[in-house]
């Protein structure tokens, strides 16, 4: 799917923040478009601005990237600071991998590598907490590509965990979520990542390239189903968006 021409002016927009020149929102973007949303793709790393308010957008997603949330680059600090906009307005926000780590930094938490320098690159187990189980069913394994993780910041609910990096999915307030794994991954993206990122598969804890594709064959159906359930919970559709403030008032 070509997202570059997706500028529907009469459809609710979801802000998409990417970090590389040729990055794609992948399956997440595809599913949002199927739900009737237009994608407003911005890349602050290359000079794009971010909105002062979320009133013009139905939600926002900050995706991953090869950089660290601890990097000194101006765009990294800009994005971390900007996340307070959807958090304060309680607008739907999703951080994926780096995006989740940026949200944690905004909340005063820390991002760091594993004490034994282990990475997660490939498919790894995921276990929902009781809070996570109350929300939805979760896949048993998910696709990962990271060498840093985040702690649990004050005010965040832990939804899912794993043995190597214990904080895998969190919720902050009624509408903000951060996930360490990559449900957006398409087959084409896996080919690209495992080709360009081949040296990273030599890092401790990483899986070999063939295991990535074997894992996708086994686990991707469950990940796809999870993403559909998550989007139902998080944003809904353009015609029937989730009213998080109403849900909060009913709790």
Q: Which residues make up each language-model segment?
A:
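N-terminal beta1-alpha1 cap of cysteine-dependent amidohydrolase-like domains
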Residues: 1-74, 78-91, 201-251
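Hydrophobic/aromatic beta-strand patches that form the interior of the parallel beta-sheet core
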Residues: 15, 40-42, 61, 94, ...
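Surface-exposed, flexible loop/turn segments at secondary-structure boundaries
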Residues: 22, 47, 68, 101, ...
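Short glycine-/acidic-enriched loop or helix-start segments at secondary-structure transitions
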Residues: 25-27, 51, 71-73, 104-106, ...
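Short, glycine/charged-enriched secondary-structure capping and boundary segments
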Residues: 29-31, 57, 74-77, 108-111, ...
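Cysteine-nucleophile active-site neighborhood
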Residues: 57-58, 62-132
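Pocket-forming structural segment of enzyme catalytic cores
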Residues: 107-188
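C-terminal helical/coil "lid" or tail adjacent to the Rossmann-like core of SAM-dependent
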Residues: 174-176, 180, 184-212
